[in-house]
């Protein structure tokens, strides 16, 4: 019988301060007062094209100074936040269910970036002033209004300037679910997708129709105010949306339920009992009157053992296990969003990262423990797990389009955004400095082919074959201008299975996992892979030498799989005829060889075995 797995994540606890702003919590050591100036979409006196009146524009641009340097914040409304059939449910004091379908298209939740900073991001709530985060030049900043207006005083401060109560990361382990006997789980778990179909699934745009539930403690925590609760959840989901864009997944809110009278399930300090109770409620109650792909419970309870979130591994699309439970433990919406992103990752088949899993910047989302610094991206291991999940389970429910409120807005010339029907948009004529664009009409000047872009030079397309983005490593590819477009083509990588690092490894979704890189990650730049004799320890099946675990038992490696178990390394401090390995009582997977690592010619590690490239990476050799 295939048994789904529950994983709990333990994080640092930062208690809610009972305040509407971070500044009022008293945890900010230093901040700067700024006055954002909204850059008008159109100069005074110009006629704006007719469009439906909305309170919140589809695109906005603000300018202010941070540390004396000008910052231009470009914002675009997150039009993939809600499903068209979005509903809200709460309960009267006598327990009567009240369900409405409120208009949510004209909302105030935005994603964006800092102008002229390609690696910047921004997540902003613009309901009453600008409230949120932006990342620029590797620094994460918080902005929040001091008064309820987008043009009056705002506070800007570095995230790192916040006082931290407990910086020690906490860890936790996996819990086997031994009680499931559902036939649906068996059928889904035994499904296998061909490599060709799996690649098709990976490239397809995916949508998770998410149903959010706030328990009675959360409702009371926010002064028993439904509006405040919904704003909190919308803000959290706006962050979650941004995290999943890299996987081509849109997390779309299909419903919000607030247990305003009393909890509908048993919620207590046991995270496992709570999530099982929530899963049973979803199956027996929720799914009968509201379709959804996944449901997440936001609770005000403090789980035992500092657990902040829990979910079923690989439970997505399953009527019994497509759920998670998240503790609302922090004033910072981004930290709650990080936990929810992590738990959704488990539902999508992702396991906890080990020490050898790497990210380009900052902490990885699927680390078993998080500290005060929010994560930025999924690791190479998470990509592997997600690909394996798609290949073996297919998760059909996330492949349908949920009919989001993604309505194409009428183009407005002069707002600085190139929209449908425009050839360019350099802003109002009085500020436009682009020699290729007619600011008044948003059309290219005569004989101009382009106005901006990495492959645009002096108003003409750069020649085909000219470099516009250099390869970063062995598994990346140079991007070249096509001669037919101003934009640099999308980032492409060598095919999965392409040899890399002097034939030490094979490319996997743009990374090159090798034993050497993993040793260096664990032991420093002088570390090397240990002699083959050290890996023979993996045939012992003890705590320091095994290939995989089954029901808590260490399974020894078969001789052909020894390079896919515990990782053994050496460095200058290693004594002769000995080898080093990494072991942690708190994280059993720590120090194991990373999936996708080369273990022979045409072979890579997967599931504690040395298997063929075609099977492991979903490719045809």
Curated annotation (Swiss-Prot):
It is found in: Secreted. Disulfide bonds join 317-397, 357-381, 359-364, 413-442, 424-437, 426-432, 436-459, 450-456, 455-481, 468-488, 475-507, 500-512, 519-569, 534-579, 547-557, 564-605, 599-610. A motif (D/ECD-tripeptide) lies at residues 474-476. Residues 410-496 form the Disintegrin domain. Residues 206-402 form the Peptidase M12B domain. One of its GO terms (molecular function) is metal ion binding. Its EC number is 3.4.24.-. Keywords: Cell adhesion impairing toxin, Disulfide bond, Fibrinogenolytic toxin, Glycoprotein, Hemostasis impairing toxin, Hydrolase, Metal-binding, Metalloprotease, Platelet aggregation inhibiting toxin, Protease, Secreted, Signal, Toxin, Zinc, Zymogen. CDD domains: ZnMc_adamalysin_II_like. It is an enzyme of class 3 (hydrolase). Binds 1 zinc ion per subunit. Glycans are attached at residues 225, 268, 319, 551. It comes from the Eukaryota. The active site is at 343. Monomer. PANTHER family: ADAM A DISINTEGRIN AND METALLOPROTEASE DOMAIN, DISINTEGRIN AND METALLOPROTEINASE DOMAIN-CONTAINING PROTEIN 28. This is Zinc metalloproteinase-disintegrin-like NaMP. It comes from Naja atra.
